[in-house]
Amino acid sequence: MDHHVSTIKPRRIQNQNVIHRLERRRISSGKAGTHWHQVRVFHQNVFPNFTVVNVEKPPCFLRKFSPDGRYFIAFSSDQTSLEIYEYQGCQAAEDLLQGYEGEILSNGNDQRSVSIRGRLFERFFVLLHITNVAANGEHLNRECSLFTDDCRCVIVGSAAYLPDEPHPPFYEVYRNSESVTPNPRSPLEDYSLHIIDLHTGRLCDTRTFKCDKVVLSHNQGLYLYKNILAILSVQQQTIHVFQVTPEGTFIDVRTIGRFCYEDDLLTVSAVFPEVQRDSQTGMANPFRDPFINSLKHRLLVYLWRRAEQDGSAMAKRRFFQYFDQLRQLRMWKMQLLDENHLFIKYTSEDVVTLRVTDPSQASFFVVYNMVTTEVIAVFENTSDELLELFENFCDLFRNATLHSEVQFPCSASSNNFARQIQRRFKDTIINAKYGGHTEAVRRLLGQLPISAQSYSGSPYLDLSLFSYDDKWVSVMERPKTCGDHPIRFYARDSGLLKFEIQAGLLGRPINHTVRRLVAFTFHPFEPFAISVQRTNAEYVVNFHMRHCCT
């Protein structure tokens, strides 16, 4: 027996040559239903392999690409206007980079480097329109934007602080019996939602919410599903539902909160005539309504019926024991599951108004049918049943790529590698000090409801194509801590290093006492990405693109 012969055979790496892959695609169609996946593999050959550090940009705040990749939006430096750019393609600056070898154009002072950094932005992005949106002292929220499915329009939000003097009237602040008490951590503001036509730059429609609290950051307080837009008023505990028309206008559909049907006021006024009389004279006082808010009433009825179905006296006693606490629950977040169903998170008023930030506070998730006005299900934030639904049907909560003909969601329910990451995270919490299974469930369900359009569809973040450290970059479009080293992307099928992304400046001493954040914006399908590093008030913009070295 020859002991020098290894019994472990090295893994055979598939041919990575792009010509070979093109020829293979030509002569072999592959398994049925895998055509799009086979085409997507070519992103392992065409990737953003070149970084230009510290690109000069106009005085604006960069936001994101439209889902079809044609447009890029930004907010003006004074946050009153929306700037609409047309993307010119990943090859737009290839002539500028002729002769450059390597992977990085650093922050050099030579004339050519300075010229490239100064001209690069206008090569990739051509300004089409500047639309003045915010008025009356309002400022656009830089983290709020929703694109319609046809990529024709974009919805943005603006807000203006209310002055201390004169203080708004009491019944403007408290418009129904569920209204919360504002505080300095959660101040009241005047809000406006605007819809702009990307093709013409025209401001098509605006809806205002005076003396209110709507969480605009990261689209937390508004959700767009196809042509249905839902907006949660945290202050008034009301969900406003609109239909977005192809022409870019808002149509009132329903208002959910104090009432669930539009004609509920007529029914109530038959029993309480003073409600109708006060409404007609402009002296309405719904804050002192003698009845329970309609949406809250449906929640309580569902819980009571569930206690009755249980059949035990203990279930009914628990309902009575916690009845007052259930009445004090307030809506915190919500999302649309489809055109008819809302997914609402209820918690205590202290959490809703940011008086308490303890994530261990009890909360409930409610599935509500807007058409039939029925509560379909209620889950606690420690529910194993809801976690199982979330893990197995995560894509239905994300609605990440509704606009795409072909879906490539990179979630725990559709991607083995994303599932592994989630399992590791779950096991880490279970085994941690003060952890455990219940804490792991609470932490995982803390992601719900999921904000609209908060996940990138870029193939370079697809975990089935590339392996990378999700600590530094991920499919969720949120700022990440900036690392000291480049982010490396390895091909999933071969394990070979394909490209690196360098965020921030090179060669500068790193101050670890200052928190450095970086936000990535990937093009939906082309090999192009933008990273914006923020350190205190300083912004560094890097472009990551495809460059053919000659």
Swiss-Prot record:
One of its GO terms (biological process) is protein-containing complex assembly. GO terms for molecular function: protein-containing complex binding; ubiquitin protein ligase binding; ubiquitin-like ligase-substrate adaptor activity. It is found in: Nucleus. Keywords: Nucleus, Ubl conjugation pathway. Component of the E3 ubiquitin ligase DCX DET1-COP1 complex, which is required for ubiquitination and subsequent degradation of target proteins. The complex is involved in JUN ubiquitination and degradation. Pfam families: Det1. GO terms for cellular component: Cul4A-RING E3 ubiquitin ligase complex; nucleus. Signal peptide: none annotated. This is DET1 homolog. InterPro entries: De-etiolated_protein_1_Det1 (IPR019138). Disulfide bonds: none annotated. Belongs to the DET1 family. Component of the DCX DET1-COP1 ubiquitin ligase complex at least composed of RBX1, DET1, DDB1, CUL4A and COP1. It comes from Mus musculus.
